[in-house]
A protein has these predicted regions:
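Ordered hydrophobic segments in well-structured contexts
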Residues: 55, 65, 90-92, 125-127
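Conserved beta-strand-loop-alpha-helix junction that forms the acyl-donor binding cleft
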Residues: 100-103, 127-129
């Protein structure tokens, strides 16, 4: 991963409106690979439910993100429910997106490596589609 890129954890209340809009826009640009969000409010609700998230920043520009849930979040996704019926605890990768102009730069790998460390440190299996 290019050293100019920075990974930052984020949660409800730690992102500004510009970053939230960038996350939303990046999400929508990556549908159908990630589920479409109905609105910014929908994104904010996901972040409220989430347990561990990362932003990839190039200076202050959001160029990637991942949103992850724990087993107790109450998330309504059918894919998430599949894992709640099979695992007692887990870290669920709900969505990950990288800006098209920044792909093939190791960003996805860096994000997943960070998620693997978080899961290992908390003795959690990772659940994803």
């Amino acid at each position: 991963m290019n050293p100019q890129y920075k990974l930052h954890t984020f949660s409800d209340g730690t992102t500004n409106e510009t970053q939230l809009q960038s996350i939303y826009d990046l999400n929508q640009a990556n549908t159908p690979e990630v589920g479409s969000l109905e609105s910014m409010n929908h994104l904010k609700q996901l972040i409220e439910l989430s347990a561990y998230n990362l932003l990839v920043l190039d200076d202050d520009e959001v160029i990637g993100f991942i949103i992850c849930m724990r087993e107790s979040s109450g998330y309504g996704s059918e894919n998430y429910k599949f894992f709640t019926q099979r695992l007692k605890k887990f870290l669920y990768v709900d969505r990950i997106a990288i800006d098209e102009q920044h792909r093939k730069a190791g960003l996805g790998q860096a994000i997943y490596e960070n998620i693997f460390v978080e899961a290992r440190n908390n003795d959690l299996p990772i659940a994803l589609e």
